[in-house]
């Protein structure tokens, strides 16, 4: 059954409505539950909108699957981000794109590092930005992944992997097959060749069903 129609971010064109089966939404959350090792003792700070795959499918579902707690805010505010993190004793949160820079642009305070954060899903993030976040807020661990509203999160960085900025990790081969293919023939290309990313799910309903018409 279709759980929701979620709209894409519109990166490559007009935003499209994606028909999301229940299992598709669940697996988004299970990715974070598994690779960020969310437990009942965690508190997730959620500022992204619930009509976005990150806000609803990744963060909220991941929290519910783990039986953890969540603090949901109506909007993201860089000026109050670290104060909320400290006030609610937050252990996990996501910073998407420019949000990293907005947070770092706020006046630094000695108390910034006095927080309970154990991991942040920051994507995409550069080496310089990751270093600044780690140094200022004493964040011990970062998570990155590659995904789309349509195809879930087929590539993610295992919890024990090094924090290499810009590295999405490995294929989550329990649920997905991924190849780099020739865009004209769909034939798999040798390692090092530039091509198109093709993703195929191994489980039923863990992918978009169709675009809404």
Q: Model-predicted segments: where are they?
A:
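Short, well-ordered beta-strand segments
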Residues: 3, 43-46, 51, 197-198
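Conserved AMP-binding/adenylation subdomain of ANL enzymes
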Residues: 26-43, 51-91, 106, 177
């Amino acid at each position: 059954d279709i759980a929701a129609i979620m709209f894409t971010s519109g990166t490559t064109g007009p935003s499209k409505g994606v028909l999301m089966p229940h299992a598709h939404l669940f697996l988004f959350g299970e990715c974070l539950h598994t690779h960020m090792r969310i437990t009942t003792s965690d508190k997730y700070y959620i500022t992204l909108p619930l009509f976005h795959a990150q806000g609803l499918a990744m963060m909220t579902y991941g929290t519910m699957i783990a039986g953890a707690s969540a603090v949901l805010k109506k909007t993201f505010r860089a000026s109050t981000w670290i104060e909320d993190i400290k006030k609610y004793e937050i252990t996990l949160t996501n910073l998407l794109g420019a949000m990293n820079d907005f947070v770092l642009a706020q006046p630094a305070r000695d108390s910034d590092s006095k927080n309970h954060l154990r991991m942040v899903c920051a994507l995409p993030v550069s080496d310089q930005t990751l270093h600044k976040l780690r140094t200022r807020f004493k964040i011990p661990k970062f998570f990155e992944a590659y995904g789309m509203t349509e195809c879930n999160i087929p590539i993610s960085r295992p919890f024990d992997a090094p924090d290499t900025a810009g590295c999405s990790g490995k294929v989550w081969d329990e649920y997905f097959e991924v190849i780099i293919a020739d865009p004209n023939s769909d034939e798999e290309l040798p390692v090092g060749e530039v091509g198109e990313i093709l993703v195929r799910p191994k489980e039923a309903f863990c992918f978009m069903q169709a675009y809404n018409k």
